[in-house]
């Protein structure tokens, strides 16, 4: 199974790149984790936000593999504690499909992305900066993997 993070935004601060890559490199070869960055639509005071969201959504869904399980990251999604995320990861592996996790832009996810999702995951009831979400998702998935393999990274 391959994990894919599909995120709106291409110019992340160095600390985001450093943090994300740190966890990315820790994943084992049998569970590769990749990032697909989607250019954010131009936002200005006269921007058509609905159209921008639609375009970002089209690009996000185009980046997802044909049979991938789509999981959106969204505040109203299901919150998973770390052991629950580890169980999810095991279920995803047993399913046999690759998993694409979608992070929207400043206005969130396009309705088409939400409609295509099989699951929606809420990291927190807080609104988080989207660059930070990349690092949190990578760390959370690495921690979940460590639980499923009895790796010493996670401690109770």
Curated annotation (Swiss-Prot):
This protein's UniProt keywords: Cytoplasm, Methyltransferase, rRNA processing, S-adenosyl-L-methionine, Transferase
Database matches in InterPro entries: Alpha/beta_knot_MTases (IPR029028), RlmH-like (IPR003742), tRNA_m1G_MTases_N (IPR029026)
Pfam families on file: SPOUT_MTase (PF02590)
Binding site for S-adenosyl-L-methionine: 73, 104, 123-128
Documented EC number(s): 2.1.1.177
Matching SUPFAM superfamilies: alpha/beta knot
Keyword ATP-binding included in the entry's annotation: no
CDD domains per record: RlmH-like
Leading EC class: transferase
NCBIfam families on file: PRK00103.1-1 (NF000984), PRK00103.1-4 (NF000986), tRNA_RlmH_YbeA (TIGR00246)
Matching PANTHER family: METHYLTRANSFERASE, RIBOSOMAL RNA LARGE SUBUNIT METHYLTRANSFERASE H
Assembly: Homodimer.
Full protein name: Ribosomal RNA large subunit methyltransferase H
Native source organism of the sequence: Yersinia pestis
């Amino acid at each position: 199974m391959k994990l894919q993070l599909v995120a709106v935004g291409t110019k992340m601060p160095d600390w985001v790149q450093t943090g994300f890559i740190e966890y990315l490199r820790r994943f084992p070869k049998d569970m590769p984790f990749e990032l697909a960055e989607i250019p954010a639509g131009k936002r200005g005071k006269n921007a058509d936000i609905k159209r921008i969201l639609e375009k970002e959504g089209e690009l996000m869904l185009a980046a997802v593999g044909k049979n991938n399980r789509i999981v959106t990251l969204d505040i109203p999604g299901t919150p998973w504690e770390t052991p629950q995320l580890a169980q999810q990861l095991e279920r995803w592996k047993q399913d046999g499909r690759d998993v694409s996790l979608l992070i929207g832009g400043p206005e969130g996810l396009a309705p088409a992305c939400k409609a295509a999702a099989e699951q929606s995951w809420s990291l927190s009831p807080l609104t988080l900066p989207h660059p930070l979400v990349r690092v949190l998702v990578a760390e959370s998935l690495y921690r979940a993997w460590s639980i499923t393999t009895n790796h010493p990274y996670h401690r109770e």
